[in-house]
Amino acid sequence: MTQTLSQLEHSEAFIERHIGSSAQQQQQLLEAVGARSLNALIQQIVPADIQLPAPPPVGDAATEHQALAELKAIASQNQRYKSYIGMGYSAVLTPPVILRNMLENPGWYTAYTPYQPEVSQGRLEALLNFQTVTLDLTGLDLASASLLDEATAAAEAMALAKRASKLKDANRFFVADDVHPQTLDVVRTRAATFGFEVIVDKAEKVLELQGVFGVLLQQVGTTGELHDYSALLAELKNRKIGTSVAADIMALVLLTAPGKQGADVVFGSAQRFGVPMGYGGPHAAFFACRDEFKRSMPGRIIGVSRDAAGNTALRMAMQTREQHIRREKANSNICTSQVLLANIASLYAVYHGPQGLQRIAGRIHRLTDILAAGLQQAGLQLRHKTWFDTLTVEVKDKAAVLERALSFGINLRTDIHGAVGITLDEATSREDVQTLFALLAGDNHGLDIDALDAAVSKNSQSIPAGMLRKDPILTHPVFNSYHSETEMMRYMHRLERKDLALNQAMIPLGSCTMKLNAAAEMIPITWPEFSELHPFCPPEQAAGYKQMIGQLSQWLVQLTGYDAVCMQPNSGAQGEYAGLLAIRHYHESRNESGRHICLIPSSAHGTNPASAQMAGMSVVVVACDKNGNIDLHDLRVKAEQAGEELSCIMVTYPSTHGVYEETIREVCQIVHQFGGQVYLDGANMNAQVGITTPGYIGADVSHLNLHKTFCIPHGGGGPGMGPIGVKAHLAPFVPGHSVVQIDGVLTQQGAVSAAPFGSASILPISWMYIRMMGAEGLKQASQVAILNANYIATRLKDAYPVLYTGRDHRVAHECILDIRPLKEETGISEMDIAKRLIDYGFHAPTMSFPVAGTLMVEPTESESKVELDRFIDAMLAIRSEIDRVAKGEWPLEDNPLVNAPHIQAELVSDWQHAYSRELAVFPIAGVRENKYWPSVKRLDDVYGDRNLFCSCVPMSEYE
């Protein structure tokens, strides 16, 4: 054997696992596109003046086991204290059946947002269950399928209140003084960009004020007190002031629904329903409102509709409210929500059912009552007379109490003047309460749990009788049927089978980068060292997180060419918002607050104008030329017209048209010449990493979609992470946090997310990816992604024109197939092709974005030549089918394209089509061996929006 030990150790092994095609297959792909090597292909495609002389120095590759061992050593530096801090975060007991069959299951976590409902019925049903839980617990009419976190939901509630307000001159938003501080922080950030005045005071003080358009209350208050807001809500309604209540989802199991008390909007975090704290996230927020506000509601709504055969089917309803259609006029900027986390919470409710939830909530409340009674018996005073799970305990020597708590391995809430806060949770046991007695009342406290239980069970008044829930919850059969693990496992598998995820086939969605989410990358997110930490624990207890985040940040600095990275934004859209706020605050620091114009090319993703609007900027559209590139003349004219009002440009690179624009540096120079900043959208970073960087190109700030480029899975529509990279002059202006000090950030910068580091517990995924790939592997990933896109474009260009190409007729990492000529000639649309692909076993490419009547294909580096060929064969076969329609062999109203997708039930019913059953479901030979069967036919979108219904339907509807 002539190999060296170094070669046998094979530290680059993961690169071959991540990149789908072998070296031999890559050579075949290169021959097909007419390039000698990967480097030669890149030289043909990427402008020479932006190519890096060497890959960014992020180190060599490591094997999966080496990287896991390194990260485990880092994670072990985190100290797992018992955290009773509360403030919207609680320890949970995730049911193992959900952990194994959903959170650790690629059939759930690798799926995309359910824009194609025919291949998404399983997770749509789980999300509908989530909405039903929300409606039952809040007492309102309409619920969304999750928002990013509770604080973001509060900001959205404020925006809704203003949109819906009939008090057009009112400009003040009132926040009760017992709302969580991080929620207030995010509300203030959003209010500042909209020019709203935020007033914080005791709830009843709002009645003394004028010019208020909305009010935010909290149930349970941040220090534990319960409030009967019925009278206040009624009076505010009389005054036409919008009302929102931030609610604890577990408390709502026992308490009267705020909607029944008169609230217009109720929202909160669903974290307590089975999702670990994870040092701040990811967690799904729930959001509900009255029916009259449905057109103003933020976020996605799952609605009950019907398919082409008249059968009940689910879809995302009223999508015309979303930013990809309405752009800067959108209700919200919901590009990534928290589907995976919402579905965990949904299935937690299904598994426990109403009785199980009442038992859990009842146990938490009983233990809190016992703790309260014991502390009072020991001579300690409580600040409030009512509570669900949180006590504020008056202490004389607070510092001594907190020091003693740490010696017990316990974290208490520290920021209440003259007192400590204690929040109990699902994981709290009677032994934990005994430990708290010893901590606060001394080792010889003499308190007996059973005796205290007997006393409080008879005469507890901590929840006033008038605030106890009287109505039943979760009466639908889905919440009363799956309580054995066997039934629950089968229910989850039944849902999973309805969906198409990466474990079934390539998902070639343009602008989405659906690459491999490797098992080794996913393993650390469930380690208790990462999953159990409270986001507001003492920083020394999170030393492992600090090291991991620090290393990841430094790698991202190298890979982007920026000087600093902020990890707080918990979605790409939030990253855009945070980056634009940094630009805004930078201009303000230079006494140039008049710079408010944001230039955006006409090809931009809808999140760009929506983010600009959220950041308080005015959007001016820059034209593109016939080749899809930014029109430099128009850019120069618009920049000059804006003059001292020019704030920035938002540009995507490679462009949203799938091309490396040759003039990108000139674009940056023009904007800088007129005093603006350059925001380079990181959506297409998978075509930059290792080849160029935004900083090298000339940009000032970018967000990175870690759920695209850096392997965090899409989760069926979230979680995501959108950290921003910035040049040094913008670094002081990235988001801060009112509870946790973030190094290097000016303290006056507000937060954009509830937790200081966003969805911190999924950052290990990106850490693992970069560590295992190394500098050369990351560059190779970008090169192969570009190669794969050019292979598809080359093979399909004669059947489907490629709309935009760059030098030498090359594309970047994605290509746009123009269906418009075919539609004009034959009547077959991009929608028909997308739905027919389901019969061939594929998720559709991105439809009608960024150009109507097109399909945008992004294959990613993780797909093998075998899978690329399978997709190409499907597209060519579909083109042959279109030709048969054009020749008149099949009528336009009855052919396998317009009738797609086809379901099993059709095969055993009367068949009266002009084509065979076999052609319908097994159109080419390769489909037979791994057939995906959709559970519904094509959805009736018009019916779904005209008949909006967004909670569970009777089980008979599915029969």
Swiss-Prot record:
Q: Which SUPFAM superfamilies match?
A: PLP-dependent transferases
Q: Which UniProt keywords apply?
A: Oxidoreductase, Pyridoxal phosphate
The record's listing under HAMAP family reads: GcvP (MF_00711)
GO cellular component terms given for this protein: cytosol; glycine cleavage complex
Organism expressing this protein natively:
Serratia proteamaculans (strain 568)
Q: E.C. number, please? A: 1.4.4.2
Q: Does the keyword Lipid metabolism apply?
A: no
Protein name, as recorded: Glycine dehydrogenase (decarboxylating)
Q: Name one GO molecular function term.
A: pyridoxal phosphate binding
Identify the CDD domains for this entry. GDC-P
Q: Which domain of life is it from?
A: Bacteria
Q: Give me the reactions it catalyses.
A: N(6)-[(R)-lipoyl]-L-lysyl-[glycine-cleavage complex H protein] + glycine + H(+) = N(6)-[(R)-S(8)-aminomethyldihydrolipoyl]-L-lysyl-[glycine-cleavage complex H protein] + CO2
Q: Which residues carry this modification: N6-(pyridoxal phosphate)lysine?
A: 708
Keyword Oxidoreductase in annotation: yes
Q: Which family does it belong to?
A: Belongs to the GcvP family.
